Amino acid sequence: MKRRRPLQLELRSQGRGGSRAGAGRKKARGSGVPHLRRPALAARHPVHVTMKLRAGLPSLRGDRSFPVVRGALKAGRRRLGIRLVHYSVQSNHLHLVVEAADASALGQGIKGLAVRLARRLNALFGTKGAVFPDRFHAHVLRSPSEVRNALGYVVHNFAHHLALDGYVVPRGTRDLLSSAAWLTAPPPETAPVVAAESWLLREGWKRARPNARS
C-alpha cells in the first residue's frame, strides 16, 4: 500500500510584513523538517505530533523539568483548538496524540502549546527564546491499526529508547512520564489529558490486531 506523506506544520509565526525573497531567519544546519503544504485533516482522524526540544537544554524528563511540562500539558489539554488525549515526555522531544477539528486548528493549538511550554521552561532554565524552534512533525491516523500502532509507540517510547541502549526492559513496564495509565481507562480530571471524542481513539483502535500494519 502506498505510504501517506506525513503532515508537517510550522510552529513559528510569520512575523511582520509580507513574503519577501531572502527574508527571515536562515535555516540552520540540521534544523527540523521541511515546510510542506498542509493536507486536509478531518476531525474524525487523530494526529500523532512530535515536538523536538532545542539543542543544549536540560532533559524534559528531569525531576524539575517534568512537573513543569506536565503542568503545561494539563493547562493546554483542551484549549486553542486541540484536545490532548495521550503523550509521552522524552529527554529531548515530546510525543502527543491529539484531536483537532482541522489542520488550521491543529496548527494553532500546537503553536499555543509550544508558547505555553516555552514560557514555563524558560523560567525554569533561565533561558530565552523558542524551546521548540522547529516545525512540528504530525502524522494523521486514519485507521484503527494506525491508531493502535501510534498509541503503542507513544506510551512505550521510553522503553524503546532504553532497549536501543542495551537495557533489558521487563514486559509490561509502564512509563510514568506518559499517559500509559489512561490507555484503557478514562482519565481523571487531575490528569494532563482528556477523554477521546473520536471513534478511532475511543473504540476503533481496540479492534485492530496487535502490530497490524496500516
Please report, for each region that a protein language model flagged, where it lies by residue.
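Short Pro-Cys-Gly-centered "Cys-loop" motif that presents a nucleophilic cysteine in a tight turn
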Residues: M1-V47, M51-S91, E99-S214
